[in-house]
Amino acid sequence: MNDTMMGTSLPYAERKRQGLMGRMPHKEESLSQQRRRIYRLVSAMQSPFDQHLLLRQLQEDNSVLFYDLVRHHLPELLPIIYTPVVGEACQRHSDLYLRSHGLYLSWHDRDELDDIFASVEQEVDVIVISDGERVLGLGDLGIGGMGICIGKLALYSAAGGINPARTLPLCVDVGTNNPALLEDDSYLGWQAPRIDGETYYHFMDKVVAAIRRRWPEVVLQFEDFAGKHAANLLARYRDELCMFNDDIQGTAAVASACVLAGLQQAGSTLADTPVLIVGAGSAGCGIAAMLARLAGSPERVQLFDQDGLVCLDRAN
């Protein structure tokens, strides 16, 4: 059976040309008619998670309709296709897996990376990559991190206008330290403790180098990497590709913009304002670094975590 991404909006003559006669109902719907019909179906779902599953299926079956629907109902549907609802989808990723979307790169594939990327026919403008070690506030979800990559790219296309056909979600499977996943027969990722240290970075070197060979102009976004790796990866590859880490730099950019806007309204400046950031994880440190640069005086920005004020003479 032939397939189409237009569904019932496909004109009669085109159905005939593609050999689709009898494969769909008679009526030719406009895109707006399709959108209203699907929106009623989404609205009738009993839970946000059921809505998420329906929208993911729509994204696979008819991406034109999916993005048209999301753009027309953006404030309502963004929390459904991304946070907070995507968290449950990431936790249940293996149970829900039906078809491939994006690429999974296992450590065992380390010598096949060029062939894997060559199998992707389209040109790619944006890649969101995750190793699933720190997914949202849920911890190590292994290949469940793929859900975050898919959801983030859907946001970029729906709200940012990036062509979805030129995006690629990419999950790096280096094992998992989650005991539940290691013992779960349904888990589809590599069931072994995570590789780390030089072995981990050697694999990431190979991944980034292969990406650069295939798409040298691509934007590479790191998503939900553990704090011990996040900043190191940025520093390691900053001269290789155009890249950023959303948890560090994206959050910092938005938070800094809010601080600057608030100070402007208050008639003050960042250089004259002491800043205390509660939380010294990837996001907190990223915000602190950006505000310190903007202020021109790092001593104006302080970090406070569960052990107190972060300072050089602190034991931990």
Label each residue range with its predicted role.
Residues 240, 245-316:
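Glycine-rich phosphate/diphosphate-binding loop of Rossmann-like nucleotide-binding domains
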Residues 1-242:
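N-terminal ligand-binding/catalytic initiation module
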